[in-house]
UniProtKB/Swiss-Prot annotation:
Organism: Variovorax paradoxus (strain S110)
Gene that encodes it: hfq
Quaternary assembly: Homohexamer.
GO process terms (BP): regulation of DNA-templated transcription; regulation of RNA stability; regulation of translation, ncRNA-mediated
Protein name: RNA-binding protein Hfq
Domain Sm: 10-69
Amino acid sequence: MSNKGQLLQDPFLNTLRREHVPVSIYLVNGIKLQGQIESFDQYVVLLRNTVTQMVYKHAISTIVPGRAVNFSAAENDDAAA
């Protein structure tokens, strides 16, 4: 994946993780997973609900936060660090 992709993904996923935002993750096959993002790396997202699931990023179509989150503030915080 390109660096530009990481510059968008990491602050987005990190904000969802830090703020314990409930998310719906839609997979490319249409399955909907729900939970909170526990962790992530270049290839996978760990999604916690009643159990923790490892979801490969190449299988993810869309991530929808369960509530409004200010991502521009998170990008500024990460840039300042």
